[in-house]
Amino acid sequence: VLTGFARAFKTPDLRKKLLFTLGIIVLYRLGAHIPVPGVSYENVQTCVDQASKGNNSLFGLVNMFSGGALLQITIFALGIMPYITASIILQLLTVVIPRLEALKKEGQSGQAKITQYTRYLTVALAILQGTGLVATARSGALFSGCPVADQIVPNQSMFTTIVMVVTMTAGTAAVMWLGELITDRGIGNGMSILMFISIAASFPSALWAIKTSGKLADGWIEFFTVILVGFVMVALVVFVEQAQRRIPVQYAKRMIGRRSYGGTSTYIPLKVNQAGVIPVIFASSLLYIPALIVQFSNSKAGWAIWIQDNLTKGTHPYYMTAYFLLIVFFAFFYVAISFNPEEVADNMKKYGGFIPGIRAGRPTAEYLSYVLNRITWPGSLYLGLIALVPTMALAGFGGANQNFPFGGTSILIIVGVGLETVKQIESQLQQRNYEGFLR
């Protein structure tokens, strides 16, 4: 990996792209530290310091994707979460709305239209999420238990509220624009790179918090245990993310005029983890809802106490069981909507392709479904284990869920984005090495 980056820096145009990407990253991290107008920075810091010493996992998912900017209430407080949510919603709607499905099949022009819809939905979600965050901050519920939580927004006039919401919405639009700039003029997928940076930015403080709150050898045993578990998980994730089942495909030879077409062989790569990190995000978001209901209802009823005791603590067996089962369910659900065996079989039949030993058409679709279901089982179990291992490791030392709110989500995203970016750099390096033969 380091060799690839070193070679990229020696190539003038790639060096320019890498430096441009680094410049955008610096701007993004700068925006994550500029407070929103109307917020008392001193009171926010007091509450953040107190929250970092305890278990404040309720807003952990959004805070992780914003690189810690959410709880700091900065102009980039919402981070890329509205964009991720909008992308997932449109991906799901593509399956149920024929118009969106037709746009998806139109190629580049259709994809441009879907991207436009994603932008509009991102802004709408940013307004909703920004309004919710400001309302939560004004009421003091953002930092429950903090003595100055209700003084985070000293001036609670309607004008101040509107300014805060507009600023956060504009910040989300700016983040989206920065991501698109990286995609167009930098290295890698822009939004993925910003997601990578947001998660990586929270690692140093999270690891140090584990050390300071640890009890064995001044916290050093917990500290190095978490690092060791992290390295093992990264190795496992890299191995599984690269694993795939290759379905061989042959194309019949056709004569058109005097030219011969086809006769080639290729394969369909079916990844073991075909669903990616989406099931973990879905499961985390769903378990996030009961905690929100309890926090905002302030109810002392039996059901609220049961939820508070069993479904908001990551170390509780009920929570871990529900989390694991939801991940397995969403893995199968997302694979079912993102990979259509019948469509793949029809496209193969249209261009004269077939799987050796399998008839074209419906038998091919059934075979692909059979193989996909078989490899999705180990993929879903792997996702569930990766999501729970950090929680169980920290629980063994009495500090679970305080720094890695949703298990292996961060590691899955970091490894996935890292592998994809390295592949793109290597691809561009190979392309430039072959330029001499193409002249």
Predicted regions span which residues?
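N-terminal cationic and glycine-rich segments that engage phosphates or anionic surfaces
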Residues: 1-104, 109-439
